[in-house]
Regions:
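Flexible, compositionally biased loop and terminal segments
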Residues: 1-197
Length: 197
């Protein structure tokens, strides 16, 4: 039987639950640089990074952390080579297919953050399937930000506000609901950048 994170690191049991962050944001950075160090192509680094992230997610599942967000692909990442972008999209699809049974078993929910209009149809379909199958789960939340950027989200919110009926009341609650995640995802309490920067 596999040991839980709390069994492996018993000192964690001494930390009161309220001291743990509610929302952890992971920015998996440095995968392409790692691949270059081992004289390989960037996609090898991204695949290795995805494997490490799966281990991290399993570790976090044992802790009283409610929301984990992985910022997998920023809006400016479209500037990367076509081969790298296409490879990343395949990795995201494979990762979602792989994580779905665990989300269902743990009664956890999946939420995509970012645009869906520019990603490949096969990935959009997988994202929508995983979101739909987990939408009633209320244990923990896993978010993956794909084609996400703060400025882009702000621009999309402004467009949505402009399209509201003229007599609509605009307040902070309305603006929160127009954010990706429909206002359910608070700002991160802890940000981990895997490259260590």
């Amino acid at each position: 039987m596999k040991k839980s994170t709390l069994d492996k690191f018993p000192l964690l049991k001494e930390i009161p639950e309220e001291k743990f962050p509610n929302h952890v944001l992971i920015i998996p950075d440095g995968n392409a640089r790692f691949a270059k160090l081992i004289h390989n192509v960037p996609l090898i680094g991204h695949r290795k990074g995805a494997q490490v992230l799966k281990t991290v997610l399993k570790t976090l599942q044992d802790l009283p952390i409610r929301i984990v967000t992985i910022w997998g692909f920023a809006t400016d990442n479209w500037k990367r080579s076509k081969q790298e972008v296409e490879g990343l999209m395949v990795i995201f699809k494979e990762a979602l297919d792989e994580v779905l049974p665990e989300l269902l078993q743990n009664k956890s929910r999946f939420i995509h953050l970012g645009r869906k209009d520019r990603i490949p149809k096969y990935l959009k379909k997988t994202i929508e399937k995983v979101e739909d199958l987990t939408k009633t789960n209320n244990n923990k939340i896993l978010c993956i930000a794909i084609d996400f950027g703060g400025e882009d989200q702000t621009f999309r919110i402004m467009q949505a506000v402009r399209n509201l009926p003229k007599d609509s009341e605009i307040n902070l609650d309305v603006l929160r609901k127009l954010r990706d995640g429909h206002g359910e995802i608070p700002p991160a309490d802890l940000i981990i950048r895997t490259s260590g920067e």
